Curated annotation (Swiss-Prot):
The gene is psb28. It comes from Synechococcus sp. (strain CC9902). Residues 110-131 are annotated as: Disordered. Belongs to the Psb28 family. InterPro entries: Psb28_c1_sf, PSII_Psb28_class-1. Transmembrane segments: none annotated. It holds the Pfam family Psb28. Residues 112-125 have a biased composition (Polar residues). One of its GO terms (biological process) is photosynthesis. Part of the photosystem II complex. This is Photosystem II reaction center Psb28 protein. GO terms for cellular component: photosystem II oxygen evolving complex; plasma membrane-derived thylakoid membrane. Keywords: Membrane, Photosynthesis, Photosystem II, Thylakoid. It is found in: Cellular thylakoid membrane.
Amino acid sequence: MAEAKGTASIQFFRGVDEPVVPDIRLTRSRDGRTGQATFVFEQPQALAPETFGNIGGMWMVDEEGEMVTREVNGKFVNGIPSALEATYTWKTEEDFERFMRFAQRYADSNGLGYSQNQKSDQTDAATEEQA
């Protein structure tokens, strides 16, 4: 569980926080009800040679409890594990809101910020200006 109020962590082994902070990308359906968060961990501690055990999922733990995804894949370079990619899928607006509360706590716990990709909006605006 999370150690203190307001903290959040990610675990590949229950009770063991992963110290490597992932790159996280969100996608949502046009109606906003469903979507995915893709986490990419480069050189995570969970893949270190001294780590024993099978990775059975990724747990996102905070003061509200935990969310879990079993969709975790390893990336290998020349036969050596180099990254983990996990995908968390939500199917309701409530699930998305819960995920975003976790994401905010995780960002706060790790000194991270949030940025939104505006590329599609900028592309549309540029196209309209050229017309």
